[in-house]
Amino acid sequence: MSSRAEELILSLAKDLVGEDATELLKFLLRKRIEMTDDDIAKELNVKVNEIRKKLYLLSEQGFITYRKTRDKETGLFIYYWKVNIDQINELLLNRKRLVLEKLKARYEQEKDSLYYYCPQDNIQYNFDEALENEFKCPKCGSPLEYYDSEKTKKFLEYKIKQIENEIERETRHGSNSR
C-alpha cells in the first residue's frame, strides 16, 4: 500500500472514529499481520478492554476484520484482527464519490448563480442576498462588487475531472484484481 493511500485511510479513519482508534489502525497497518486483542494490548501497553473498544469501533466502520476461533483449553473465543484492505479501498472510493457529488452540486450552483462580495469583509453573497441588502454589505455597509466565478468554475471542472478519472481508474483496477 502506498504512503499516499495510507494517509488517505488514516485521514478518513480520523474523521470517522477519532484520533485514538486511528492510532490503533496505524499500528495494525504497520504490522500487516493478524493479531489477537491480547497481543495488541501487550505490544501497545494498553488495557485489553481499551483495545477491544477501539477494535470494535474500527470494525464497525469496515477498517478492520476479524476471525474467531475457540480456545481448546478454556473454551473461550480468541479473536484475530487484521486490516481489511478490500473494504478500505471501497470506503475510499465511496468517499471520493461523495466528494464528487458535492463538487458537481457546487459547480451547478456556481454556473447558475451570480455572486457579489464585500471587498472589506471578503464575504460572498448570492444575487438574492445582494439585492435584499441593496448591494451593500450588511456587516459594514460597503458597496458589494460583482464576483466573477469563472476561476472557481474552472477549478471545480478540473477537480471533478480529476476525481472522475481516479474513480474510473480505481474501479477498473479493483475489478481486474478480483
Swiss-Prot record:
SUPFAM superfamilies: Winged helix' DNA-binding domain
Regions annotated as coiled coil: none
GO BP, one annotated term: regulation of DNA-templated transcription
GO MF annotations, alphabetized: DNA binding
The keyword Transcription regulation belongs to this UniProt entry's keyword annotation: yes
Origin: domain of life: Archaea
InterPro entries found in the cross-reference section: TF_E_archaea, TFE, TFIIE/TFIIEa_HTH, TFIIE_asu, TFIIEa/SarR/Rpc3_HTH_dom, WH-like_DNA-bd_sf, WH_DNA-bd_sf
SMART domains for the chain: TFIIE
Domain HTH TFE/IIEalpha-type: 5-89
Membrane-spanning residues: none
Keyword Phosphoprotein: no
Keyword tags: DNA-binding, Transcription, Transcription regulation
Subunit architecture: Monomer. Interaction with RNA polymerase subunits RpoF and RpoE is necessary for Tfe stimulatory transcription activity. Able to interact with Tbp and RNA polymerase in the absence of DNA promoter. Interacts both with the preinitiation and elongation complexes.
Record function comment: Transcription factor that plays a role in the activation of archaeal genes transcribed by RNA polymerase. Facilitates transcription initiation by enhancing TATA-box recognition by TATA-box-binding protein (Tbp), and transcription factor B (Tfb) and RNA polymerase recruitment. Not absolutely required for transcription in vitro, but particularly important in cases where Tbp or Tfb function is not optimal. It dynamically alters the nucleic acid-binding properties of RNA polymerases by stabilizing the initiation complex and destabilizing elongation complexes.
Notes concerning its domains: The winged helix domain is involved in binding to DNA in the preinitiation complex.
Protein name, as recorded: Transcription factor E
Organism ancestry: Archaea, Thermoproteota, Thermoprotei, Sulfolobales, Sulfolobaceae
This protein's encoding gene: tfe
